[in-house]
Amino acid sequence: MTHTLIWTLNSPEKLSSLSKTLIEDEKYSCFVSKTSLFEIAIKKNLGKLYFYSSFEDLQKELSTLKIEFLEIELGHLEFYLSLPQIPIHKDPFDRLIISTAAVENLKIITKDEKFNLYQDIVETVW
């Protein structure tokens, strides 16, 4: 999911046509979990990602695209605790994004096939 945000802003040619439509067409609502922002902050801090000088600039860009932020809520964290432990997928950021999408009844736009491990919990599109 975080890669979808990065590609939307830096490399839109990497997005599938369906993903672009879902993100850009105003008849759809599009959200980004603040979990993704935390993941971006970590990658920036480690020098693994060069992405916007500030989160305020990022927020302005997302608002032009009509993309809204999802706060991390207690219900998302409670759901996180109930997610099945899958040995080949332990990424805490992905798991919190999955929990958020499940609680909010949202689809996840991702190319990451590991999200398919949770197909009984959330729907993914690419």
In which residue ranges do the predicted regions lie?
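A secondary-structure boundary/capping signal
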Residues: 1-2, 33, 73, 111
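General small-molecule cofactor/ligand-binding pocket signal
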Residues: 31, 70, 123-125
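Active-site neighborhoods of divalent-metal-dependent phosphate/nucleic-acid chemistry enzymes
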Residues: 52, 64-111
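Short, well-structured N-terminal submotif of metal-dependent ribonuclease cores
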Residues: 1-32, 48-60, 118-119
